[in-house]
Amino acid sequence: METLANIHPGEILSEEFLKPMNISAYKLSKDIGIPQTRTSAILKGVRAITADTALRLSLYFGTSAKFWLGLQDDFDLEEVFKNKQVELSKIKKKEDYAA
């Protein structure tokens, strides 16, 4: 069974928001008051969406900040699981005990 690629929030920002609305990275940066380098890094998938950026995107697009942070959290968790699967598989569940 083929696994799906882990999608960075920057790809969702680009494909689901910027392209359909014909908004450039420069315009987004200017409109929400962040450096264009930050926007470009997010769109390239090399920078995470922070709480600050999530709030700005939510106000601009009429979404919630939790939407953007949730996308980032999902991406981060999948990356850690993928990169540390062997190490994480060694962790055993703590058995319940009476105190």
Task: Kindly give the residue locations of the regions a language model identified.
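A short, Lys/Arg-rich alpha-helix, primarily the initiator
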Residues: 1-23, 70
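Short alpha-helical DNA-recognition segment
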Residues: 22-41
